[in-house]
Amino acid sequence: MSHLAILPTVLRDLELLVGALEGLDLQPERDSRVIGFAGEAQPVAVAIRLQDGQQLGWRRQQDGSLALVGDLSRLSRRHDLPPLLGEITRAYAARLALREASAHLPGAELTVVS
């Protein structure tokens, strides 16, 4: 039996996460729900739907971090999940680095080149 699981992450900024997801053409949906086995649902701040229809979402934790929400039993069968999560994390980190750099270098023009 599969069910939705909530995993802690180091991500904290929802806007940076949404920007990273959009940059990867993952079409984030704000204020959504992730649906798991037998209709089990968890509200999330943002969700994406993968090509096979499975969902990943992120919800705010009490400590301010964004926890990953998904049906891990089903998602663990996907061989592309670890690389995808790595891409999302790298895109988030790049946006965070640009934001921090622009805060320390007012007037500088900074862009991401991939």
Annotate each predicted stretch with a short phrase.
Residues 1-114:
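Interaction-mediating elements
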